[in-house]
Amino acid sequence: MLRSVVNNNDKAKESEQSVRVATDDPTYQSYAFQPSTSSSNISWFGGLRTKLSQLSLFPDWMSQLGIKSDDEKMETSSTSSPQSEQSIGEYDESTLVFRPVQLDHFGGAGQEDDGEQVDIWDFGATFLADLDSNHVWNDTIERQHFGPLKDLITTGGGANKINNHSFKTHSLLHPTWCDKCGDFIWGILKEALKCEHCNYTCHARCRDLVTLDCRSPGSSLASSTEFDSIYPQLDGTLGTIPKGLILPPAMSSSTGSDKENGNGNSAGISAENPIFSVKNSFTLPKSFSPVDSLRTKEPSAPPESRYATLRVVERYVKEDTPFEWTDEYKEMDLERKIHSYNSLAKGMEITLHEDGVNFGGHIHVNMNLSRPISVVQGVIPPTVYDVVNTAKSTAKTTSLRTITSFFLPRNTAKVINIDSKTTARKMIVTLLKKFRVADNPRKFALYECEQITDEATCTLNRKLTRISDDACPLKVVLNWQSPHCGRALVLQENDTGDILWDAFEIPELENFLRILGMEEKQYVFQTQQKYQQYRYHLDAELRQRGHSVPDAAAQPMVQTNPFLDEEFLRNQDEYGTSDSMLFSGTIKNAIMGEDPDYVNLEYLKKQNMDQSTNL
């Protein structure tokens, strides 16, 4: 590690902020900076922070930005070693926490964590202790979990653009996130693009940047390329199956791939999903039951009448109140409930802690994701050139990282270890951090899936209940009394409109309200202007045909909504107030002096009015 240190005590105050620190550690490459030599900027920032520190919400906001207060700095300096005062940042590999450079003194950050590495699926108290810090629990709209996501190279799907998606304009009834850039898509007048086959959702501006192949939700593991068989083709009937033979359906495994589940000649499960509207079907016997599937039954009817189509009906239930706050959950006689659960859960036991209140154990989480996820790769090791020329190119060289998008196989099951104090939101955030998933944690939600089979109608009723972010998944599992009761924890996209608006910051909520009010006024103005245009051209047509019109309507002017803040709109680019919101093309065209998209003046002028009334 190369460092240039100023040891002159007389010039220490003058050159304290101009000390140039260089390092060959690849961890710090993404935080390379050009130190400022002006002391006026530092004093200006210190005075501004002193003025703003009088506000009640300022300390929390500063902590989210990574700038510590004076009390936190004293605690950090008291616990740090002399070696830590020389580093410019801190990198904790077990929790992937990035802490920025302090503006007051560049050499006053903490040291690296020398503790033992936590198991990849161990979400015990050692790992969850860091979730209380502001650096980890920074679940904002922007993707900030792995440091600044800059200088990334897209590797998923190759470097060429993919055009096999069937994108359709999709009106957003509920807010969501873009699968390409990860920005927030929100607004009544906003229209996103959604693929009909793989549910890929993105901005209109991100369509040309998509490099991921289209893949239907039911074939996430199926290969898109067909390879020729290496075996020769045999003539005759050698090894063939008679056409009149009816084969029983192959029983599929819950953890197998789609090819193992019988995605061959016979179809899949007929699923009616209100979110994705995906429908497949495969043939199963009428006597099929998930509980009694291993039990052999005698055929009671001819083979042709023993088969029917299994119909799967999914019903989503919103859970507003945390489960442990309801009357159904009781913490009385906790030791007896844990003993009863462990007698049926072999290998998934729950252990009661010494305090007699908290407990921990293993749970199954099925990751049923239909939309792609983006994974950030770690820092690339430095080359020999970077090590030799570190002192010259530290301020110009940035760390090169990659981000890869792919479809996670459906029903991917993971076993994790949590305790009774871990909430659903913390578990989701921690799980995504371990996978280095760059998607916003609010994009996902945890559901409790309950399956009930109706043999009379050959229907599998699946009830998905949203587990509140404040609820503890381990307490929910303990209330099942058995891990084999037909229930499971499912992690999937939060596309049911259950966005927790109370988790946003106050400036973000105020911005949402302002944009929502502007869009409401713009929508009303569009409707009024549309019918004024029709009235004007109808009156003109009646006068042309010789009919007397008592009150001739004046031609309305094509202009923007006078209720909108034009100065505010002029300062917006095509990305809106930030990279996470879009303004409609109507507002943009009106500002630029063009005709709005919702009024087709050329058609009304050139065509007859009897044809224009069919619009």
UniProtKB/Swiss-Prot annotation:
<protein>
    <recommendedName>
        <fullName>Ras association domain-containing protein 1 homolog</fullName>
    </recommendedName>
</protein>
<feature type="compositionally biased region" description="Polar residues">
    <location>
        <begin position="251"/>
        <end position="268"/>
    </location>
</feature>
<dbReference type="InterPro" id="IPR011524">
    <property type="entry name" value="SARAH_dom"/>
</dbReference>
<dbReference type="GO" id="GO:0030261">
    <property type="term" value="P:chromosome condensation"/>
</dbReference>
<dbReference type="GO" id="GO:0042327">
    <property type="term" value="P:positive regulation of phosphorylation"/>
</dbReference>
<dbReference type="InterPro" id="IPR046349">
    <property type="entry name" value="C1-like_sf"/>
</dbReference>
<keyword id="KW-0863">Zinc-finger</keyword>
<keyword id="KW-0862">Zinc</keyword>
<dbReference type="GO" id="GO:1902884">
    <property type="term" value="P:positive regulation of response to oxidative stress"/>
</dbReference>
<dbReference type="GO" id="GO:0040028">
    <property type="term" value="P:regulation of vulval development"/>
</dbReference>
<dbReference type="GO" id="GO:0007015">
    <property type="term" value="P:actin filament organization"/>
</dbReference>
<comment type="function">
    <text>Involved in embryonic morphogenesis. Plays a role in the organization of apical filamentous actin in epithelial cells of the developing embryo. May play a role in let-60-mediated vulval development. May induce nuclear condensation. Positively regulates the oxidative stress response, and this may be in association with the small GTPase rab-39. Not required for muscle integrity.</text>
</comment>
<dbReference type="InterPro" id="IPR033614">
    <property type="entry name" value="RASSF1-6"/>
</dbReference>
<feature type="region of interest" description="Disordered">
    <location>
        <begin position="1"/>
        <end position="29"/>
    </location>
</feature>
<feature type="region of interest" description="Disordered">
    <location>
        <begin position="249"/>
        <end position="268"/>
    </location>
</feature>
<feature type="compositionally biased region" description="Low complexity">
    <location>
        <begin position="76"/>
        <end position="87"/>
    </location>
</feature>
<feature type="domain" description="SARAH">
    <location>
        <begin position="498"/>
        <end position="545"/>
    </location>
</feature>
<dbReference type="Pfam" id="PF00130">
    <property type="entry name" value="C1_1"/>
</dbReference>
<keyword id="KW-0963">Cytoplasm</keyword>
<dbReference type="GO" id="GO:0005737">
    <property type="term" value="C:cytoplasm"/>
</dbReference>
<keyword id="KW-0206">Cytoskeleton</keyword>
<dbReference type="GO" id="GO:0007165">
    <property type="term" value="P:signal transduction"/>
</dbReference>
<feature type="domain" description="Ras-associating">
    <location>
        <begin position="396"/>
        <end position="496"/>
    </location>
</feature>
<dbReference type="InterPro" id="IPR002219">
    <property type="entry name" value="PE/DAG-bd"/>
</dbReference>
<dbReference type="GO" id="GO:0008270">
    <property type="term" value="F:zinc ion binding"/>
</dbReference>
<dbReference type="GO" id="GO:0005874">
    <property type="term" value="C:microtubule"/>
</dbReference>
<dbReference type="GO" id="GO:0031267">
    <property type="term" value="F:small GTPase binding"/>
</dbReference>
<keyword id="KW-0479">Metal-binding</keyword>
<keyword id="KW-0493">Microtubule</keyword>
<dbReference type="Pfam" id="PF16517">
    <property type="entry name" value="Nore1-SARAH"/>
</dbReference>
<dbReference type="InterPro" id="IPR029071">
    <property type="entry name" value="Ubiquitin-like_domsf"/>
</dbReference>
<dbReference type="GO" id="GO:0016331">
    <property type="term" value="P:morphogenesis of embryonic epithelium"/>
</dbReference>
<dbReference type="InterPro" id="IPR020454">
    <property type="entry name" value="DAG/PE-bd"/>
</dbReference>
<feature type="region of interest" description="Disordered">
    <location>
        <begin position="69"/>
        <end position="89"/>
    </location>
</feature>
<comment type="subunit">
    <text>Interacts with rab-39 (GTP-bound form). Interacts (via SARAH domain) with cst-1; the interaction is required for the phosphorylation of cst-1.</text>
</comment>
<dbReference type="Pfam" id="PF00788">
    <property type="entry name" value="RA"/>
</dbReference>
<dbReference type="InterPro" id="IPR000159">
    <property type="entry name" value="RA_dom"/>
</dbReference>
<feature type="zinc finger region" description="Phorbol-ester/DAG-type">
    <location>
        <begin position="164"/>
        <end position="214"/>
    </location>
</feature>
